C-alpha cells in the first residue's frame, strides 16, 4: 500500500511512520505537515490511505478530508488525532477509521487491516462480474497498446499521438502537456498520465516532470552532478538527483 501521514507535529509524524513500517505492508509512506504539502503529493502520485490529524497549522484536517473526498481517485482516510470530539464529523466524511494519540501498535494494525479489506472488496466487486472483468481486461489492453492519449480541456477532448508528446509536467497544481502541435493544461495529476503513456520512451526525470526521451535534443552537465535537457521544442528540464541513476540507465549513459 501507499500512504501519506499528515501531521504538523514532527514527533507524531515520525512515530506513526515508525509504527507503520513495523507492519511492513507499505511500499511507500510519505509525510506532510500541512494541507498544501498534502495536496501537492496527491498531484504527483496515487495513494491508498491518508493518516490525517485534525488540528493542522494552516487548515482543519476535516476541511482537507472534504477536499480529498471530492477527488477522482480519493484515498481512504484514517483520522489520527489526540481528540475524540470530532469522531462523528469524521465518519460523516466517510473516514474508514479514527485512531487516537498516543498511538498503539495494535490499534494501528487494526486500522490498516480495515483499509486492506476495503481495497480487497473493491477488487472482488469487479472480479465477481464476468462482463466487468472482461471490459477491464479489454480497457487495460487498449491502454497498453494505444498510441494515442485523450486529453480533456474545457469540455473538449483532444486526441494526441504519443509520439507527439514532448513532456508532461506539474506546476502550482496545473498539469501541462507539451506536444509538437500545442500545449494543453489540465487538472489531472501527473500519475494519471504516467499510467496512460507507460511505454519505454517515457520516463520521470523529476517528481513533477515526465519526458519523452525521443524528443531530447541535448543533454548538458548541470549543478550538483545532474543534467539539463533541451527538448526538440527548446524547453529545458532538469533531471533531479533522485532520478539520475534511472535516467542514465534508460539513456545508456552508464
UniProtKB/Swiss-Prot annotation:
Domain of life: Bacteria
Occurrences of domain Response regulatory (ranges): 2-116
Residue ranges, compositional bias (Polar residues): 129-138
Subcellular location(s) of the protein: Cytoplasm
Region (Disordered), start-end ranges: 120-143
Single GO MF descriptor: phosphorelay response regulator activity
Record field: transmembrane: none
InterPro entries in alphabetical order: CheY-like_superfamily, LytR-like, LytTR_DNA-bd_dom, Sig_transdc_resp-reg_receiver
Domain HTH LytTR-type: 149-253
One Pfam assignment: LytTR
GO CC annotation terms, alphabetical: cytoplasm
Record keywords, A-Z: Cytoplasm, DNA-binding, Phosphoprotein, Transcription, Transcription regulation, Two-component regulatory system
4-aspartylphosphate carried by residues: 53
Post-translational modification summary for this protein: Phosphorylated by LytS.
Job description of the protein: Member of the two-component regulatory system LytR/LytS that probably regulates genes involved in cell wall metabolism.
Name under which the protein is recorded: Sensory transduction protein LytR
Species assigned in the record: Staphylococcus saprophyticus subsp. saprophyticus (strain ATCC 15305 / DSM 20229 / NCIMB 8711 / NCTC 7292 / S-41)
Top-level taxonomy: Bacteria, Bacillati, Bacillota, Bacilli, Bacillales
